[in-house]
Swiss-Prot record:
Chain intervals with Polar residues compositional bias: 111-170
Function: Plays an important role in DNA replication, recombination and repair. Binds to ssDNA and to an array of partner proteins to recruit them to their sites of action during DNA metabolism.
Protein's name in the database: Single-stranded DNA-binding protein
GO MF terms held by the record: single-stranded DNA binding
Coiled coil: none
Gene3D superfamilies recorded: Nucleic acid-binding proteins
Region (Disordered): 107-181
UniProt keyword annotations, A-Z: DNA damage, DNA recombination, DNA repair, DNA replication, DNA-binding
């Protein structure tokens, strides 16, 4: 079966970092994401989704070092189901994301150390601390695209034939201050 989640959201709280008995880092983050839609009566509605994500290994340590409440991130991973009994014997459950990779989405800061870390995380997969039964990809997924044949498409060809849709798409100007979280 295919189980892949890609989510962009903002942290709802600071990173909670712990170390497992094996010495590997494990972190939990809370994400909030929203979707805007038009209701039947024509008014705009908004649906907000809150979900926890689990990070492991170096990814957990980097998240703890550079992220805080309100930071914007992109998480790629898989959906997992957790169930447990509380102290009163009541059964509880929830879905979480077990992250395979993490990308910072905020604007680059004035901190050169954070900038270089953000650049290096864009194409890397930090999943070195998963249990041994998890089959992590052994190579960079972006490098696989180079093995496919490329079409003879050049910039000159694209400019020689103007698209009939070229001027029909309106430009959207979104101010980050207008984002609700």
């Amino acid at each position: 079966m295919f189980n892949k989640v890609i989510m962009v959201g903002r942290l709802t709280r600071n990173v909670e970092l712990k170390y497992l008995p094996s010495g590997s880092a494990a972190a939990t983050i809370g994400l909030a994401t929203s979707r805007r839609f038009k209701k039947q009566d024509g008014t705009l509605g908004e649906e907000v989704c809150f979900i926890d994500a689990r990070l492991f290994g170096r990814t957990a340590e980097i998240a703890n070092q550079y992220l805080s409440k309100g930071s914007s991130v992109l998480i790629e991973g898989r959906l997992t189901y957790e169930s447990w009994m509380d102290q009163t014997g009541k059964k509880n459950s929830r879905h979480t994301i077990t992250a395979d990779s993490l990308q910072f989405m905020d604007k680059k800061s004035d901190n050169p150390q954070a900038n270089s870390m953000q650049d290096s995380m864009t194409h890397e997969n930090f999943n070195n601390a998963y249990p041994t039964n998890y089959n992590a990809p052994s190579q960079d997924p972006f490098s696989q695209a180079q093995s496919y044949p490329q079409n003879a498409y050049t910039k000159e060809n694209s400019q020689a034939q103007p698209s009939k849709y070229q001027n029909s798409v309106p430009e959207i100007n979104i101010d980050e201050e207008e984002i609700p979280f």
